[in-house]
Regions:
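Gly/serine-rich nucleotide phosphate-binding loop at the start of the catalytic core
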Residues: 1-58, 62, 72
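Single, function-defining residue in the core of a domain
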Residues: 1, 32-35, 42, 58-62, ...
Length: 332
């Protein structure tokens, strides 16, 4: 935190246009402890909504991948709760892989069930929601189906399913997998757990020989398309890895719950701003390179669309190739 304050204060000539002054370490510490994370969460929601409106016309804009990523915390965060695997927090995200657009559902303790957070989010009509077996909640599945939306997930091992009808197999080969079976199923039990919606089970075999059963309420897509939708879920794992590597959310500036949540939301706000800037200025660079250049040129006046190019030389100022006080070398 002292290094952050020192680096900021070293750029004092740029503070005027930001309406800021010098920064003290105690100011950062107080803000981390007292500033409400809800303000940052709302700001990120507005930015993500703006990105969503810009990409609404895309063909793949209606695919939503839902997952959570662990945020392990050290021994100094003795307030953090454990779920048996790690102690810390979890960040729950809805991800549109077509335009790399994430939305933060919530940041919770590690012991909060994923399904509890997933069903609290709004269901988008016509969207396809892809998630793993941790989001198993029949009431939420009914709400998705009632909204005219679809889900693709994996059934739990203790979920009793009976085959109602075998569907004919058309194309079987997908990218990295082969379809083994396509069946319409129903719950074997007749208790409260029975779902009053049509279900379909698609069994696929990956190239490594592992077999995976998928459960969906989508009866229109082909079995290969259903398998490809679930395979796309791994794109959110790549997003989590990218965020942790490049947005400074492995180490935190504070040890209290409030400060850590603020830093997580601030990182997501930075991600959304960078995506908006790259899209608005038609940046052709790879996104990671663009992020690195923005960090390098943060306190310089540069055109975002040409951030990789050196600034133009002032034509009104005569340039000197040498200075009279410059040391010269004379070769005999």
């Amino acid at each position: 935190m002292r290094g952050l304050a020192a680096g900021w204060n070293a750029e004092a000539q740029h503070h005027y246009h930001l309406a800021c002054g010098e920064l003290a370490r105690s100011t950062l510490a107080d803000a981390g402890a007292r500033r409400p994370p809800a303000v940052f969460a709302e700001a990120f929601g507005l930015l993500a909504g703006q990105l969503d409106r810009q990409t609404r016309g895309d063909a793949d804009a209606m695919l939503r991948i839902i997952d959570s990523t662990p945020i392990p915390l050290g021994k100094l965060c003795d307030w953090a709760k454990s779920n048996g695997r790690f102690r810390g927090l979890k960040m729950h995200v809805v991800f549109n892989p077509g335009r790399a657009l994430p939305r933060v559902l919530d940041i919770t303790d590690a012991n909060v069930n994923d399904a509890r957070v997933g069903r609290a989010g709004a269901v988008e009509a016509g969207a396809t929601h892809v998630f793993d077996k941790g989001y198993c909640h029949y009431g939420w599945w009914r709400a998705i189906d009632a909204a005219g939306s679809f889900f693709v997930t994996r059934p739990k091992t203790n979920m009793g399913l009976a085959v109602a009808r075998a569907r004919p197999l058309g194309e079987r080969a997908g990218e990295g997998f082969v379809v083994l079976a396509d069946e319409e199923v129903r719950f074997a039990s007749k208790g409260d757990s029975k779902l009053p919606i049509a279900l379909r089970r698609v069994t696929i075999e990956r190239d490594d020989g592992r077999q995976i059963a998928l459960l969906t309420n989508d009866l229109a897509r082909s079995a290969v398309e259903v398998g490809a939708l679930y395979k796309a879920r791994w794109q959110i794992e790549l997003l989590f890895r990218w965020l942790k590597q490049h947005l400074k959310i492995r180490r935190f500036l504070g040890n209290n719950d409030n400060a850590i949540r603020l830093q997580l939301y601030a990182a997501m706000i930075a991600y959304a701003l960078l995506r908006l800037a790259a899209r608005a200025n038609a940046v052709k660079l790879p996104f990671l390179r663009f992020v690195d250049l923005v960090a390098t040129c943060l306190f310089e006046r540069r055109k975002i669309g040409a951030i990789e190019k050196p600034p133009p030389v002032n034509p009104t100022r005569a340039s000197q190739k040498t200075s009279p006080d410059q040391l010269g070398f004379c070769y005999a």
